[in-house]
Amino acid sequence: MIRKGFFVRIFLFLIVIFSPVTLLAHGTILIKNVEHSEGFIDVKIYTNEETFLKEELSYETVRKKAMKGEVIIPLSKIHEGKIAIVVYHDEDGNGELKTGLFWRPKEGFAFSNNYNPKGPPKFKKAAIMLEHGVPVAIELNY
């Protein structure tokens, strides 16, 4: 005979396992200031200067449906170490960042380390130390 307490313990265990806080326990990026729900949020993770901004050489790529406000991006390949994160809001869903005069982005974009370059972006200025279990917050600029 199974006691009632057994089911309560299983229920509590499942709540803990599937709670949003638990989802943030691994490498996680919180994309803030998403202006609207159109398109996708594209995230590229780079681990060194040589591959930085070479999309086909990014260490990890995540593309997730945009949601107004905040989007949680879980990382599956990396959970700690030195990385640079590049994020853009692909508003029209074409897979490319729209740029204007002097290649200035026309869609929401951001780099890790609150880096807002005035010229060509540099890995060492965008680089951060990703700590296991500590989410990284990045605010999009439009």
Where do the protein language model's features map onto the residues?
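Primarily secretory-pathway and cell-envelope proteins
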Residues: L24-T47, T99-Y142
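Surface-exposed loops/turns
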Residues: H36, M67, H79-E80
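Acidic, glycine-anchored loop motifs typical of Ca2+
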Residues: D92-K98
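Exposed aromatic-hydrophobic patches
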Residues: E70-K77
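Short proline/glycine- and polar residue-rich coil/turn motifs
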Residues: R63-G69, L130
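N-terminal signal peptide c-region/cleavage motif recognized by signal peptidases
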Residues: S19-P20
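A short tyrosine-centered beta-strand micro-motif
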Residues: I83-V87
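Bacterial N-terminal signal peptides that target proteins for export
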Residues: I2-F11
